[in-house]
Amino acid sequence: MIRNFIIIAWRNLVRKKSFSFINITGLGIGMAAAMLILLWIQNEVSYDKFHTNKERLFEVWNRYNVEGSLGCWNNTPKPMAAAIQQDYPEIEKVARVSFLPPLQITVGEKKFYGRGRIVDSTFLQMFSFPLLKGNVNEALNGIYSIVLTDKLAKTMFGNEDPMGKTIRMDNTDNFIVSGIVTNPPYNSQFEFEFLIDWAYMRHKDRDDPYWSNNSVTTYAMLKPGALLSSIQSKLKTLRKKYDKEDPGMETFLYPLTRSHLYGKFENGIETGGRIEIVRLFGIIAAFILIIACINFMNLSTARSEKRAKEVGIRKVVGAQKKSLITQFLGESVLLALIAGILALIIVELALPAFNTLIDKKLFLDYSSGRFWLMLFAFILISGILAGSYPAIYLSSFKPVRVLKGNLKAGNALVTPRKILVITQFTFAIVLIIATIVVRQQIQKAQDRQTGYSKDNLVYHFMEGTVEKNYTLIKNELLASGTAVSVTKTSAPITEGWSNSWGMEWQGKDPEDKTTIDRFCADDAFIKTTGLQLVEGRDFDLKNFPTDSNAALINESAVKTMRFKQPVGQVIKDMGQEWHVIGVIKDFVLKSPYQPIEPMFVAGAKAWFNVIHIKLNNKNATAKNVASMTAIFKKYNPDYEFNYRFTDKEYAKKFNDEKRTGKLASLFALLTIIISCLGLFGLSSYMAENRIKEIGVRKVLGASVGSIVSLLSKDFLKLILIAFIIASPIAWWAMNKWLSGFPYRTAIYWWVFAGAGLAAILIALLTVSFQAIKAGMSNPVKALRTE
């Protein structure tokens, strides 16, 4: 019987080639789109779940009352790890992680750049990064021990055994390779190419004991069977015991496996995070697949009259409804199987471009039995979902009516078909509106005034002898006409690396724990960056040696500190008094989507990490770059000149939203294509079923235009209804998404009008092809048997 079902199903697919092509193509595209999204979702939800002890691993977080609301963050002071290990026996191990900028690594005459982390020796014991060479308990057990990833080791040493080899880091210290670790998987929050033991930090006197300096990430691993709720309760008083400046701050543990997706807090409560995007695209995947299945349902029911006699005869000879349903479901599963093969081909072809778009390394794991099981289940579910309604409908025909030729599509068939078309285009219109709004939000942020001049502004990290030779480099850049101004800062102008809630000033409320961004800068800071000075002056150590104790503050800081005359005020920070010499206009330091925070810029003598260079715009960019390269090579010969243009770095702030916008655009386009395929097939069958009516109308003088109008108007009504339903749904969804951005665009009426008009035009073009074809047909052929 099964063999017979398969033969019948195959014959039906071959007999109706156009029907089969539209269904297989539409379902294949829908399945491919859903598979791509599901691959991405699987990657997102699997973050940090490969660790053997994942259920016992936690990040250490802080919770504090800031301006009446609870703020949460995962930056911790360096001494906290030792305090936790000492005071809480329920915690088995603790590890700190400090991030490093890309550092130059020298092996013989060869130079490389690598991204690393400074970690406690317990790091490899807590987290599942297997060692290919070396011992987990000894690899990170010395001041100059270094563990390399397999990829970096092969890049530097080729096929040689790297163990015990000496490498020079940042042209300052020699390290001994003590281990080779597997490359961190793509679903790990830890991205590194080498690991250095925390003992190096202590040796360099950087392991400061200050509880006010929240500069590292701390991780804890509980002992088996330890009760989390009990530990959480005890941790609340940790700061009270050790932190004399902020004893009211609370400490708590946050599951490592949740940090990637859920690490967003509002007023001390976990409110989501990246999981919101994951859920959104999960819904998109489901709807794309449903839309593809709707095509199958519509086309199958549309050609029901063609198969009515088959059903009638089979029922007369004894076929049961159950066996007919099984046959029709078998046909849809067979079609889904072919569509699934097409989907796999599409996914394989699209994956490289898709990975580039989302900045991932996703792949189909054909060696995994789980993959094939999931694929089979996916195809089976798609086939059953697509074929369930047509199977039930076709199997319900009454043989007497069918064999008398009395079967006509009434409301029982037409109404569900209309609902399905409306559903398709409702979702398509929602996606079109969402795509436009996302792009508007990105454009809104891009158009926001940064407050400084990005053009011709270059920065370079101070590595090697740059800081030592800073004055010589600066003078030569200016003398050569390459630059018009040069300054050094603690961080790039596009980033905020430090903040504090412990600053003091006259009139400050003791309960005020406002977080203030901290920045350090040198002479010509304002001139180089193009910031606007509201009052006072720029740093000028040459004419004002006391500027090493001077500070600039922004307008938001003036409001926060309630200064009526800010210039001359004294601010205490980092155990030092700073005299305000000027006020700068607010500028975007961090996210362009967020409000500008109060900012304090210290004219310190130390803490410099970056040199900013304002290039001479009278020279060609290539000439300026060549000149800078030669000057830096002269004074810092052991390092490559790795410069960055500020405008390009600032543009990277929009990458996530741009990626979301591109994905929304892509899947909106696919949704429209799938919907139009179904509409094309449906209009073809509608024209075929009304061919005699069209013939009569043409004989009576109807024009091609009137025929097109006749066949198109019903579809256009459905699109209009879909637009009416989609508009409030899209408004609600996008308003909810935009609520996460304090600096956001408005949702304009013309977005909805444009999306609706686009949907109508696309549908009209799709239907018109078949309508024009029917309108231009010869009525004699349609009426010759009448």
Model regions and ranges:
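Alpha-helical transmembrane segments of integral membrane proteins
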Residues: M1-F21, G268-E270, S300-L337, I341, ...
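Membrane-helix entry/capping segments
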Residues: I2-R11, R15, H51-T52, A226, ...
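Generic structural signal for small/hydrophobic residues in well-ordered secondary structure
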Residues: L13-K16, N23, E44, V60, ...
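Hydrophobic alpha-helical transmembrane segments of multi-pass inner-membrane transport and secretion
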Residues: R15-Q42, G273-K309, L337, P416-V438, ...
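Mid-to-C-terminal secondary-structure elements
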Residues: D120-K133, I146-G273, L472-D656
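Interfacial "coupling" helices/loops that link adjacent transmembrane helices in transporter permeases
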Residues: A292-L334, G678-L716, Q770, S777-N778
